[in-house]
Amino acid sequence: MNLYNIKHPEEQVTFSQAVRQGLGRDQGLFFPEVIPQLNNINELLELPLVERSQKILGALIDGELPQATLDAMVKNAFTFPAPLEKVEENIYALELFHGPTLAFKDFGGRFMAQALAAVRGDGKITILTATSGDTGAAVAHAFYGLENINVVILYPKGKISPLQEKLFCTLGGNIRTVAINADFDACQALVKQAFDDVELRQAIGLNSANSINISRLLAQVCYYFEAVAQLPKEKRDNVVVSVPSGNFGNLTAGLIAKTLGLPIKRFVASTNANDTVPRYLKSGNWDPKTTVATLSNAMDVSRPNNWPRVEELFKRNGWDLTDLGSGMLSDSETEDTLKAMQSKGYLCEPHGAIAYQVLKDQLKASETGIFLCTAHPAKFKESVERILGIQLPLPETLDKHNQLPLLSDEMDNDFAQLRAYLLKS
């Protein structure tokens, strides 16, 4: 598999190099030179998740890893289901929260850990990543205890849910967590500064586990196939998928699935008040505003890292960017939507609720809608209980971590401090 740097197309790397490096020159994102057209989609849709994913990832990575190695990586990573649940006539929820940290990022985080272990070679690696909520837990649990890999996770202090924080800030060992006195965009900027520091990168073997790492995106492609595979065959012709969007990695993965030949008619990018992309699609002006805190904190992102990949896919496929649906919900609208979903017998959380409502508003009578549920409602226990007036029992994994003390360090939004911290980690 060959990839190129979107900013500097002359910079070309293999899959193994892209996994190890994370980012290219000038913080450029790596992107596959070729995305093959799969001609056996119907056959693939008949297979179970793991076997189908082994074939999809085998086609994408294209022989760079032995198929037996890749098969083992997928089998070890995808140890949990992604069920499709009917919410109402023609609208389905793809539940991506049945993994060990109860969020969709378990798919990408666990596959990336497997990939890095397979291609890293000798020497220590430091994973530096920023999280607005779920990435931190998925990465921490995927890499916890792996030899010669240290993990440092930055997150905005006070801007993620207490349960999210407990899931990744209580492990210790090779997992270090840092609460930054700033918002998530500032955390991402610190990560990018670290990657621009060539001396630092070489000194600590720097890598990233954010969705900028191609291995995470490729893993996420697989659950779009799983969604369509669970639909009745008569409903597979006019499928619309609504994706709750923050950094836009999830949407990028869906667009790669469509490029491979998965029959998805169109996508809808659903955001909260941090609506840089919906405004851009309407006006043509890229105008990120100051990030605001919302109920759906994992989408509190004003400068989405993966947007260049989205534009690259539209350009390469000859698609019109205006065909990408979009919409946003305020917090009060999100609360109303959660109540409406509860009345239909479906318990959700803010991110999934936004994806549901934006989909419902834009779905045509002839279409079948799927919205992505990216986290278990209990991960947002306080807000969901307040809004719906219910008591949510904690799943066992959350309850266990909720009893443990936080092990985080705290730091100002200061790259010099972070650099010194990384060098002594």
Swiss-Prot record:
Its cofactor is pyridoxal 5'-phosphate. It holds the Pfam family Thr_synth_N. GO terms for molecular function: pyridoxal phosphate binding; threonine synthase activity. Keywords: Amino-acid biosynthesis, Lyase, Pyridoxal phosphate, Threonine biosynthesis. It catalyses: O-phospho-L-homoserine + H2O = L-threonine + phosphate. SUPFAM superfamilies: Tryptophan synthase beta subunit-like PLP-dependent enzymes. It is an enzyme of class 4 (lyase). Pathway: Amino-acid biosynthesis; L-threonine biosynthesis; L-threonine from L-aspartate: step 5/5. Its EC number is 4.2.3.1. It comes from the Bacteria. The modification N6-(pyridoxal phosphate)lysine is found at residue 105. The keyword Lyase applies. GO terms for biological process: threonine biosynthetic process. Belongs to the threonine synthase family. Catalyzes the gamma-elimination of phosphate from L-phosphohomoserine and the beta-addition of water to produce L-threonine. This is Threonine synthase.
